[in-house]
């Protein structure tokens, strides 16, 4: 009996009107993550997807890949058989090992015309297993093995252990955002969380050579590739902005404590213009409220005021550092993020950054320079390069 992979959809099942589009996007994303596996067959159902023709592949590796795809509730190894009791019983036996264990059977009928009801299916399959496997015992409360039987209109599906999927919504179903990506821990995690809500992403990062090194940029590129799993989770581009000219001019402002605030205001201005040009509907940052001096409410308001109500998403706003680090390890970005290469913000930070900036003071400081806006225009038009992550 040949196993198949059986996938149950996640939240998208709730979206009645948009179900067809949601499933279409999810199936496309699954095919992308499994693109290296040839000759697989995908059978799309109302609330499930079956993947067959798996004989030549490592099922564990395929399942590990599928666990990264947003929109999947759970994944399992299953058997698809004819709607004959004897076939269903044999499929149940595939999950039995040669050692003592407890089990329980659950059954559900989509096809109510099947000649046995759910209770009868459970009883007859359990009796068959007990007769053929003397080490088995029934435990309906805390079984070591739970066998699920689903009677469909065209077949029966039998599966055991459920492997939790990434849940969320299929990437690409909810538009596009531009992520301000640094080399730190937070923004890569923010990227994945925003993808979980069905948003596809591009990245922008800011470099300040010679103050930042090529290794720092290489680290950011590696992070972008890990976030997107080499562009299998979403087709993303990384835009690299050489910010050195602006940074050098901002260094001359009269209030050193506002240096980071002004730098971030220009980050936002550049990111907004780029977002509009790449048809992104929002910016995404890795800010977490109160985590560092520049991430207070006043600071966020002062920095975001340059955007004229362009949407900024901050998925980490209520997370503490330990939670963010835990997620970074889950997404395999943590070890890259802690590589010792400084980014623009860390190198440029004053000794005592203001935690209580205001819009009026920031705007007045920007007006001190007669050339700041001209340099900003030059940087946006001449100092941004695009890196394809594929």
From Swiss-Prot:
Enzyme class name: transferase
PANTHER family assigned to the protein according to its UniProt record, in alphabetical order: TRNA SULFURTRANSFERASE
GO biological process, one term: thiamine diphosphate biosynthetic process
Residues bound to ATP: 180-181, 205-206, 264, 286, 295
Signal peptide: none
One cellular component (GO) term of this entry: cytosol
Cell location: Cytoplasm
Domain THUMP: from-to ranges: 60-162
Function: Catalyzes the ATP-dependent transfer of a sulfur to tRNA to produce 4-thiouridine in position 8 of tRNAs, which functions as a near-UV photosensor. Also catalyzes the transfer of sulfur to the sulfur carrier protein ThiS, forming ThiS-thiocarboxylate. This is a step in the synthesis of thiazole, in the thiamine biosynthesis pathway. The sulfur is donated as persulfide by IscS.
Protein name as it appears in the record: Probable tRNA sulfurtransferase
Organismal lineage: Bacteria, Bacillati, Mycoplasmatota, Mycoplasmoidales, Mycoplasmoidaceae
EC number: 2.8.1.4
NCBIfam families registered for this protein in UniProt: tRNA uracil 4-sulfurtransferase ThiI (TIGR00342)
Pfam families: ThiI, ThiI_fer, THUMP
Organism: Ureaplasma parvum serovar 3 (strain ATCC 700970)
GO MF annotation, one: CCA tRNA nucleotidyltransferase activity
Keyword tags: ATP-binding, Cytoplasm, Nucleotide-binding, RNA-binding, Thiamine biosynthesis, Transferase, tRNA-binding
Family: Belongs to the ThiI family.
Pathway entry: Cofactor biosynthesis; thiamine diphosphate biosynthesis
Reactions mediated catalytically: [ThiI sulfur-carrier protein]-S-sulfanyl-L-cysteine + a uridine in tRNA + 2 reduced [2Fe-2S]-[ferredoxin] + ATP + H(+) = [ThiI sulfur-carrier protein]-L-cysteine + a 4-thiouridine in tRNA + 2 oxidized [2Fe-2S]-[ferredoxin] + AMP + diphosphate; [ThiS sulfur-carrier protein]-C-terminal Gly-Gly-AMP + S-sulfanyl-L-cysteinyl-[cysteine desulfurase] + AH2 = [ThiS sulfur-carrier protein]-C-terminal-Gly-aminoethanethioate + L-cysteinyl-[cysteine desulfurase] + A + AMP + 2 H(+)
């Amino acid at each position: 009996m040949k196993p198949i992979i059986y996938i149950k959809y996640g939240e998208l099942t709730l979206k009645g009107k948009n179900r067809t589009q949601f499933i279409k996007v999810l199936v496309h994303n699954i095919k992308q993550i499994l693109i290296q596996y040839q000759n697989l067959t995908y059978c799309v159902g109302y609330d499930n997807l079956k993947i067959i023709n798996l004989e030549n592949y490592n099922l564990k590796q395929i399942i590990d890949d599928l666990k990264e795809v947003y929109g999947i509730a759970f994944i399992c190894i299953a058997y698809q058989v004819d709607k004959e009791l004897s076939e269903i019983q044999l499929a149940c036996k595939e999950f039995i090992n040669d050692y003592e264990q407890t089990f329980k059977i659950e059954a559900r009928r989509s096809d109510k015309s099947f000649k046995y009801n759910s209770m009868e299916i459970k009883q007859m399959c359990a009796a068959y297993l007990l007769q053929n496997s003397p080490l088995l015992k029934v435990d309906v409360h805390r079984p070591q093995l739970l066998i699920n039987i689903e009677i469909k209109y065209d077949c029966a599906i039998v599966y055991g252990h459920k492997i939790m999927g990434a849940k969320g919504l299929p990437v690409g179903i909810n538009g596009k955002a531009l992520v301000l990506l640094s080399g730190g821990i937070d923004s890569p995690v923010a990227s994945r969380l925003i993808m979980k809500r069905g948003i596809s992403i591009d990245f922008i990062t800011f470099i300040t050579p010679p103050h930042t090194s090529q290794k720092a940029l290489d680290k950011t590129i590696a992070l972008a590739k890990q976030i997107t799993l080499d562009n299998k989770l979403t087709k993303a581009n990384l835009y690299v902005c050489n910010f050195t000219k602006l940074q050098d001019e901002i260094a001359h402002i009269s209030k050193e404590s506002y240096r980071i605030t002004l730098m971030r205001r220009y980050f936002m201005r550049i990111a907004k213009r780029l977002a509009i040009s790449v048809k992104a509907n929002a910016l995404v940052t890795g800010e977490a409220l109160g985590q560092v001096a520049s991430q207070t409410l006043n600071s966020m308001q002062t920095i975001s005021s340059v955007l004229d109500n362009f949407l900024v998403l901050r998925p980490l706003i209520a997370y503490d550092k330990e939670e963010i680090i835990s997620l970074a390890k889950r997404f395999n970005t943590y070890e890259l993020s802690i590589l010792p290469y400084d980014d623009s913000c860390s190198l440029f930070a004053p000794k005592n950054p203001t935690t209580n900036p205001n819009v009026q003071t920031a705007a007045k400081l920007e007006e001190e320079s007669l050339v700041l806006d001209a340099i900003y225009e030059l940087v946006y038009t001449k100092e941004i390069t695009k890196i394809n992550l594929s």
